[in-house]
Structures are given as C-alpha cells and as structure tokens.
C-alpha cells in the first residue's frame, strides 16, 4: 500500500510533474524505530536498482521522499532530472559562520540490483530482524542518506545552525559511475557547490578491530576506475566443425589472463600511512612485515584494504553466441579495472600486452583516482568527534579500492573524504555487505552514526 502526493521535479529542461510515493507495510506490527532507522527503512522500500548501461528503475520516488523531508525542515531543496526518472536532490543549509568554506555532505539514492531468490528476506522490504535493518541499500548507502537527514534535522529542530554552510546531496546513478548524477550536476550546475571546498560521503568512518582494538577507517583516497569491453572476432560456423578462429576461445583466453593476473604491490602515500599505523598498533616494525600480512591483521576491513595494495582486473560479464550448435563470430566481455591514481595509461598498456593483439579493447567508462591528505582541520575535527563518542579509538587513513561521487566533486577542486560513521561489532563483516546478499546494518550503529554526524556538523 502506498500514498501519493504531487510534487514538481526541476531539471535542466524545466519542471515536470510526478507522483511521489511513500511505501508502507501491510504486514504485522513493526518494531518501534528511531528516526534514522525509520528513514533508512523507508528509503530501502523504494527499489532504486541501477542495472548500468542506462537501465535503471530510477531514483525519482526516493528523491521526492527526501525532498519532502527536507521541506519539512524548512529548507528549499531542488530536484534535478538528468534523464527521465534519474533524479538528484540538492539543498543548501546556511551555517552559523557563512564566511567559512562550505562542506558538501552527500550520498546516493540508487542501489545495485538484488535477486530475491538469493536473499533470506525481501531485499526491498526494509525488514528489521535480530537488531538489524536488512535490505538493499542498508549499507550502500541509504544508511548514510538517513543519517544525513536525521543529523541535519536534529540541528535545525533545536533552533541551531551547522557551523558552516552545508550542501546536502542525495544523488542519482553513483552505481554506474555517476554520469547521470554527480557528474551531471558538476558539469551542468556547478554553481550548486559554490563556496564548498571539502566533502564527506560513504565508505569511511566505520570501525574495524586491529589486535582486539576498535579502530576507525577514514577514507582519504580512491583508486582510479577503468571499465573496458573486450571483443574477440572469429569465424562463424557449425558447432560440429573444426574452427581454429573461435571467437569464444580467444575471448576466454584473454579473460583468464586478466582474471588471474597478480599485479605488483604499489604503496601510495595513503596506504603507507595506514600500514605504519597498523604496525604501531600491533607493535611491530613496519619494515619487517610484508604489506599483505599487515593488511590481514586489519580485521574485517581487510576485504577493502587488500584491494588497495595493487591493481585489479576483474572480468564481470560475458556475452557470446545465440544457439548451442552455432559457433559465433563475435564474443565480448566486460572487465572492471581499478588501479592506483595516475597509473591509468600504464595499466591499460599492460592489459594490451597481456591479452595480445587478437582481442579488441574498448574503453567504456573511466574516472580518476584520488588522494587527499590525512591532515588539516576537517581530519582533526573528524578525529576529535570520534574520540568524543568512542574515546581512545584510533582513526586511520585508507585508500578505497572502489570509488564514490567524490571523484566528480574533485573536478571542482573539492577535497573528498569517506566518512559515514558506524560503530560495529568485531564479527560484523562490513565490506561483505557492499553489493552482497542479505545486506544489513545494526540499528545501534545507525543511531551512533547520526549522533556522530550531528556533532561534527554542529562543531566543524
């Protein structure tokens, strides 16, 4: 059962009418939830699956839910529609000291698809069970969207102001590189971010355990992104014939080479600093322990950090043929490449050398790598804020093996950090939740995150 009210959507081409829906459960009585969990649950119930390649359910309904919540706080949000149904929300919050540089606080509203057959709950049901909120987007990243709304709401309802101007962004299309979301806004509406010099968003601020000591990872860098298509050509023919120029075989060989490639370890400034801090906590000499071994001591966070040590070339999709007994003349594969900032050209050259000249390479999408200093007033404020809420817990920098909308904002000179604070138990495999089956987030972690975020936005 849904309720609907009419709102307008402002895009580059003007305003269009659309109905916004607020999903409600028709099942058994649900547990009492605090505001952050309730908002996150509501957002999960909007299926904003982004399939890539221009295929998406769209973010419009979720965007209009957010727009209504922001208007209830007395703000004047704008909705920007890059293509039909692909909607981002931007709102500016005046700070107590508007002369200070502004801070962009942003999340994305789209999610990757989920196959209900693989889940133990409805991935878009917003189910609360075992002290956790389950559903696609519970971690990536409707949790942060909810924490943003709650933190800003708490500040404004108390009659206060954030310390500086905030630009709140709830963006479309992050899961497909942000072309229709952050990159669209940066290109077509850069004035939205006037005065802002820094940003915070996802995949940082969460806790892990190192030698039994809870520590927080602040994301201060991102690997570069290169999405390529491999295309092998051959001779079409009957499946019973001897066909040496088999496109599928040629493609399979290239895919296997890239998928098995062990790229060398490359330590960026961010990763060097991280390993030094890990070694200090473990009380070992960083020069006497291999980087791989140190990373394995970072608790569940090793799932992210291992990927930050070296380039990865992961095949993700295959397409070939149309009938069992027909050898096709073309076969294609998609490969997701993530490399260190500044190494894009060298890595592509090595990929070409690895697969040879018989397979074509088409670059589908690229985005830059980033490294931001683990120093300065914002880093100091984040560290101090976490210490107020979890005294004595170290804060460590790390390079994200994936990417965020901070890449687009960097084109405007905005320095981005990953800070969506969550205090997690030691057995919570947080990296496995991203794009995983049975994605979920602890309710108490959501409450912690909204408190920390409110504190930071009030004081920085």
What is each model feature region?
Residues 3-6, 406:
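Alpha-helix boundary/capping motif
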Residues 92, 106-108, 171, 229-233, ...:
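Residue-level recognition of well-ordered beta-strand positions that form the cores
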Residues 20-136, 155-164, 335:
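Acidic/His- and Gly-rich active-site-bordering loop/insert found
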Residues 129-140, 393-396, 437-438:
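Short pre-catalytic strand/loop immediately N-terminal to key active-site residues, enriched for Gly-Thr
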Residues 133, 139-217:
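Acidic/histidine-rich catalytic neighborhood of metal-dependent amide-processing enzymes
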Residues 83, 107-109, 202-204, 232, ...:
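Fold-independent oxyanion-binding glycine-rich loops
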Residues 19-24, 31, 205-214, 218-221, ...:
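Metal-dependent amide/peptide-bond hydrolase catalytic core
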């Amino acid at each position: 059962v849904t309720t609907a009210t009419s709102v307008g959507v402002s895009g580059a081409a003007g305003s269009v009418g659309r109905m916004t829906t607020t999903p409600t459960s028709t099942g058994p009585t649900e547990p009492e939830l605090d505001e952050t969990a309730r908002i996150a649950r509501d957002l999960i119930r909007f299926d904003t699956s982004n399939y890539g390649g221009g295929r998406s359910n769209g973010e419009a309904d979720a965007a209009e839910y957010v727009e209504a919540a922001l208007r209830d706080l007395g703000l004047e949000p704008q909705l920007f529609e890059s293509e039909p149904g692909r909607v981002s929300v931007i709102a500016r919050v005046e700070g107590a000291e508007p002369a200070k540089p502004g801070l962009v606080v942003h999340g994305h509203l789209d999610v990757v698809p989920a196959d209900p057959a693989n889940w133990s709950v409805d991935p878009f049901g917003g189910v609360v069970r075992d002290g956790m909120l389950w559903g696609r987007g519970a971690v990536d990243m409707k949790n942060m969207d909810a924490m943003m709304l709650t933190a800003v709401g708490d500040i404004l309802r108390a009659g206060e102001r954030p310390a500086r101007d905030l630009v709140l962004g709830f963006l479309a299309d992050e899961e497909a590189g942000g072309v229709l979301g952050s990159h669209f806004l940066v290109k077509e509406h850069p004035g939205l971010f006037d005065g802002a010099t820094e940003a915070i968003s996802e995949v940082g601020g969460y806790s892990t355990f190192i030698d039994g000591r809870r520590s927080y990872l602040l994301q201060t860098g991102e690997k570069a992104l290169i999405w390529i298509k491999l295309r092998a050509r051959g001779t079409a023919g009957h499946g019973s014939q001897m066909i040496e120029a088999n496109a599928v075989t040629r493609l399979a060989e290239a895919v296997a080479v890239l998928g098995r490639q062990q790229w060398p370890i490359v330590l960026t400034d961010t990763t060097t600093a991280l390993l030094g801090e890990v070694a200090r906590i473990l009380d070992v000499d960083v020069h006497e322990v291999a980087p791989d071994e140190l990373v394995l001591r970072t608790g569940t966070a090793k799932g992210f950090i291992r990927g930050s040590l070296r380039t990865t070339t992961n095949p993700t999709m295959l397409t070939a043929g149309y009938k069992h007994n027909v050898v096709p003349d073309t076969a294609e594969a998609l490969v997701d490449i993530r490399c260190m900032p500044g190494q894009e050209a060298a890595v592509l050259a090595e990929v070409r050398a690895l697969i040879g000249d018989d397979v074509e390479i088409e670059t589908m999408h690229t985005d830059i790598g980033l490294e931001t200093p683990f120093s300065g007033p914002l880093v100091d404020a984040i560290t101090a804020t976490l210490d107020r809420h979890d005294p004595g817990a170290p804060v460590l920098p790390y390079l994200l093996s994936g990417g965020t909308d901070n890449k687009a904002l960097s084109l405007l000179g905005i320095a981005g950090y990953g800070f969506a604070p969550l205090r997690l138990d030691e057995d919570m495999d947080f990296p496995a939740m991203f794009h995983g089956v049975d994605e979920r987030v602890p309710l108490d972690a959501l409450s912690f995150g909204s408190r920390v975020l409110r504190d930071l936005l009030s004081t920085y």
